[in-house]
Amino acid sequence: KHVTVRGKDLVVTYGKQAWMDPGHATARKWSLAVIQDVVRRYDIDGVHLDDYFYPYPQGKRSFPDDATYKAYRDGGGKLDRGDWRRSNIDGFVKDLYELVHADKPWVWVGISPFGIARPGVPRGIEAGLDQYAGLYADVPKWLRNGWLDYLAPQLYWPIDRKQQDFEVLLDYWHEQNVKGRAIWPGLYTSKIRDGGGQIRATELRDEIRLTRRKDAVMPGHIHFSFKALRGDHALVGRQLLREVYTATAAVPVLPWLPQRK
């Protein structure tokens, strides 16, 4: 019953992986139907998507969607391929938000995208990946349109790194948040290691404090991943309990959503 068997015409090979082609309307509907089935059958709190839309580029090889793009153009479509790919993802995100809330309006919908919208945005920020032109994810647009209940940008850099400054990036995402959705940045907790690592426990502590100062109404953050906390790598669990997790956290209320029935 796997999609690579039942829906062979929806799947393409890119590198060593099989991908459902977002340019195929049936592929998008298939994914939405799977999510809708989970929402309807199970008592879930939310639907969370990670940072995979179109795949991360593999060298100079382009994603193999010539057939679906040709069908779009033959049908009268006018968008260039980049804008067409973004429109496919935009439509999926919008449809997902509406579909989930049509069934259970209290279920949260959130996405954790790559933490930098584009290289040079905001000014001075550097990135080896342009998610707008590489993953075809126009994340600021999703925020502006209110197609998310929370956004968890993967801010996996320290506060004092000029090229990818945690605070500068967090401020940027808050500035895009005209609908007042929750902004809960992802922290790179998994990079903490006993005996050293790319991230120190004090850095996480400072980032958590910063997120609380920036948003006193709906503060929050997400750890990637819980493994370091559970293993208390470099005593991070104990330090956070002592310095920033001193009280039980209440589940946030998202005021634009109804209460669970």
Would you name each region that the model predicts?
Residues 16-30, 122-133, 194-202:
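Active-site mouth loops of central-metabolism enzymes
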Residues 136-162, 174-260:
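Substrate-binding cleft of secreted/luminal carbohydrate-active enzymes
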Residues 1, 6-9, 41-80:
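Active-site-proximal loop/short-helix segments
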Residues 46-50, 109-112, 223:
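Short beta-strand segments at enzyme active-site cores
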Residues 62-124, 129-195:
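Glycoside hydrolase catalytic-domain groove-lining segments
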Residues 36-50, 98-105:
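Secondary-structure boundary elements
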Residues 1-41, 134:
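Active-site-adjacent "subsite" loops/lids of carbohydrate-active enzymes
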Residues 50-56, 113-116, 227:
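Short, solvent-exposed turn/loop segments enriched in Gly/Ser/Thr/Pro and often Arg
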